[in-house]
């Protein structure tokens, strides 16, 4: 036994000796790193630093504890330190080896940990086809809104936003996208997803009163989710109604049970959710099995709008907000690339409106105009006024009196007051009971408020006229459906709904957009528009003798040979063809009104379509060169005669215009454009007459006598088409003859509510309108026909100080003119129809920048 113990001790001694001799020792080195140790259980027996969640309290954490164990719970990015990290339950995203399998990698995992090229550093995609992984038969569409992203930000600070700049470079972008009026958040977001103007979808502002509901709408009121406020069909319903799936990560209207349903997936708005969490959730939706995966997704972030409101659009803070928005886009694109979806998904990045600088030194107070402000006012950059006692006094409120008291009261006012019916037609802001009758159009950087208690006047705001440059929004698009490296002209956001439907191969619901007008953004347009079909062909108005007896009351003592003068109206076929080539170079305006009775009247210098329903031309068309004649015409009272081609019963008479009336005869084709007396006599006929308010003729005559020759010189000639508009019910569409009779029952000759003018020239001004092989350029106006010029405070002002500004205020799209007249322009153009639609939806901008 003793021998055994001695042997055991000897063996231990030998073993220890060998161990010491060979340098072997027990693994008891103190721990110095948290790598693979985060959230381990604390042990008093362990040597070295700790990595449990209480180590900071004991001041025993390893030096890399914050970077290794804390930062992953706060960061949405990988780092070299995090690569191959041990899986932790509470991280925002993972950089572990199994994260791809678990589908919870940080979006930059492959570029940071696997050495792959990031999306930002990739070359622009060169393939013309979608490159989608298995299971994606159709490209998903993501609609991403960055609230308040003014188009000018991208012009000024593009180098500070590398991700957005790459999207712009590689995809399709517009210099800007035009918001609808008022340029507010809910208004424009809902327009984008319905294709409807606010007057059509009902969200006419962020704050609304509806007398029929007797309810108020605001962004914070519980009534906001009442479906009665929300009209139209938002894109997420169009998607689901046609068998696809839609998911919305915030969008105005998406959490409302519109038409009885919600999007397939939706989130209740919560502004505290980080942008990165929103992107991560969107990416998870794209990871879903095919049967659950959405085909359409919205994503919304509040920046740079929130910062713009607080600090204004020109500030260091706005740059930081833009960089945050840029990083959010970068995170989305990296996440798409990690899923091999970056060249599969179609992405539209846009904004709802821009942002403008404001100051408490630039306020207009209603107390300066009224002894007592006894009404309710929606204050700010897009003010409206109504009765404060509603619903009782809603309909009896003296809106006209309010407008009078706010018109031409100071030498310099920073707003103009309008009845809604007199607002520029381009705004499409009248045809809804929720739009109050009194509206103030406020100058840039100014606001109109009740009194001096108003204090929300520093920083930035929006809501102004949508023609102001500061209100312009961004539009960028990227993906296999869009052309690459493509810049397009500006367009209005009502067109985006149709565009999205085309990308998803859906049939759009009725909307205010012009379907096909954005085909030039797409590689392979899904929808090919068809030409409008004329509903009514012209009748014949043959040349005939002067009626006897002549009861027209017209006279012209300067005509010595009436037969010879009238014979000039009897053009043969060759002369008619020559007249059409000169006066209708882009085809005859087609009449889309049903049961309209009219005939074409050819003269050498102009052609008109005379309506036997309203006893005046529907339109008159002529072409003037860069140096039109400016001889003084005979006055209408001295020289007018019946058009012998029009039966007396279907003609205006001079006796319709009595000196004591406010209405006077005006001409569509100016007689003074004739280069000889005979050519002027061709225009001094009753078929060229339109009834005009005497006050309006000041504008009309200055426009034709001064501005039209000026524009002709600048554009190397013009084709001019003008005519009356009848919109008595203010719905933005032409009134039928029966509707006109409802409003005008005391005369056979109705008074137009507006007049339109469409000026067309060659884009390349080397060429004339008659010889234009390339693109056309258009300038069109819809001029309210009002009895006075109080809109311009022009009673004592020379015409040159106000007329041009007035007509520029009332610029319009050709498409607006078409809707209000029932006419179809440019029917003779040989170019593809989508190019013509671009021309028709173009809106010129005249607003001068703020000094």
Swiss-Prot record:
Its cofactor is a divalent metal cation. Expressed by venom gland. Residues 1-23 form the signal peptide. A divalent metal cation 1 binds at residues 305, 309, 462. Its EC number is 3.6.1.-. Residues 30-73, 74-118 form the SMB domain. PROSITE patterns: SMB_1 (PS00524), SMB_2 (PS50958). AMP binds at residues 271, 309. The keyword Hydrolase applies. Glycans are attached at residues 39, 216, 259, 270, 405, 512, 594, 745. A divalent metal cation 2 binds at residues 147, 185, 352-353. Binds 2 divalent metal cations per subunit. Belongs to the nucleotide pyrophosphatase/phosphodiesterase family. This is Venom phosphodiesterase.
